[in-house]
Amino acid sequence: MSNPNPATPPAPSWFAGFAAVALLGYAAFLGLNFSPFAGGSDSSGYLNAAKLLARGQLTAPPRDFAGLTVSSPTQLQPLGFIAEPARGRLVPTYPLGLPAHLALAGLLFGWTAGPLVVGVGATLAAIFLLYAIAREFRFVWPLAALGSVLFGAFPVTIFVAVQPLSDVLATTWVLAAFYAALRARASLDWAVAAGIALAVAVFVRPTNVLVLPALVVLLGAHWRSLAAFLIGGLPGALLLLAANAHLFGSPWRMGYVPVFEAFRLVYAAPTLLHFAKWLGAFAPGLVIVLAVAGFRPRSLSIRERLALALWFFVPFSVYACYEFSHEVWWGLRFILPAVPALILVALAALDHWLHSRPRLLAPAIALLLLWAVGGAVFWTRHFHTLLTKTYERAYADVGVWARTHLPADTVVTAHAESGALYYYTPFPILRWDQMSPAEFSAHAAHLARAGRPLHLVVHESEESSALNERAPARWEKVAALSQRTIWRYVGPAP
């Protein structure tokens, strides 16, 4: 097979050097602000799972609670885990794709540099792949470069790129699958690569399977291409199903909440308004207008337009019904793997409009570049995105302090800090937010009889709830740091 795409003029020789310098500068910006810490539920969940994989384990054995029995397994599970006391294990709730990347990078570069390599590397790869895809769609190099900048400057991209989260990595592997599918017109090897890339993308985020219809359309009706694509993706699909069966008891179950609970039509209306509001705010307004018009230009074939439409609208529509999509501005991260399709369609419209107006190419691109970069600066400051490292470091500081100052045989009870404490310490973790006062009193008495110290870690904002409502007792404050307080159990409440 030969690639039917007519060649576009190559970029000038100076562009490669300029792009390399720009990417290095962007990488330095992300690297300086990257948070490699196990903090809240997401970052600690991924890093805890990565540590297990690095040790050759899928699940963690229980830590020693001195024979404590509980009424609910949730009392024994740090954030990011499902506790199964009957089977003697903790099961990570997050998909294994990102933890596998983190585990490999952690073994090669250490657990501080490793997450940074994955996070920054995935972002740079996504930017490069988007440029390459735009060139495959026959856009001139300045437009392709504009598309990459639009993605890199997207405020949600920056927000997730400075944390050990799966969103950018999920997007990178989706982009790799689409690039390979476009190249598959020239070689069946690329169709196999597209299947492999999609399998990895689904390992990173299972809902990436939603881009499958778009890839099938892009590959076309050639049965050889589709068969090669299937050959590439099938081993990964079988491995994912086997992992699900081992971890969650069924090939079709995952660690997330059940699909029919998390995805409901009742969420669609508020989420669509939420998505429209923040896409309009974050993307240059002209990009949205161009994207709407971009399905008409003849610069794209009908098959290409259909593939781009499916790439964007299928994930967009499904996540519009997701319980958590409309809660915060960064809920847009759920549809980040679909955002490149929106950018590509906008580029198609711009390419069509500028075809007969070549003198306007440079001013139009300059305007959109300034708009995108200016918006990135404004929103990054507005949402204090670059303070993420400071916020997440607080969890690590508390974990390191606990490991170095608390007795080796202590049991720690915590809520928001539970995943981080599991990562940074060897202590058994109890969840005070999952207990009634009576249950806490019984657990504390059991641990006291066993001669085990008990400490409570809590954010200052939750002190009243923890100390007075959930875990009433006589407590002695032993430390205060990073807006958290650490308390030692002295005895039952008077």
Where are these regions (language model features)?
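Interfacial juxtamembrane loops and adjacent helix segments
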Residues: 51, 55-98, 102-108, 260-266
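Membrane-lumen/periplasm interface segments of multi-pass, membrane-embedded glycan/lipid transferases
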Residues: 84, 241, 245-300, 320-321, ...
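Transmembrane-helix motifs of polytopic, lipid-linked glycan transferases
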Residues: 104, 114-138, 176
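Hydrophobic, aromatic-rich transmembrane alpha-helices
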Residues: 127, 217-220, 280-309, 313-316, ...
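Signature aromatic-anchored transmembrane alpha helix within multi-pass, membrane-resident enzymes
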Residues: 14-23, 196, 230-238, 301-305, ...
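Perimembrane helix-loop-helix junctions
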Residues: 180-187, 192, 210-237, 262-263, ...
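Membrane-embedded, lumen/periplasm-facing catalytic core of multi-pass transferases
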Residues: 364-417, 448
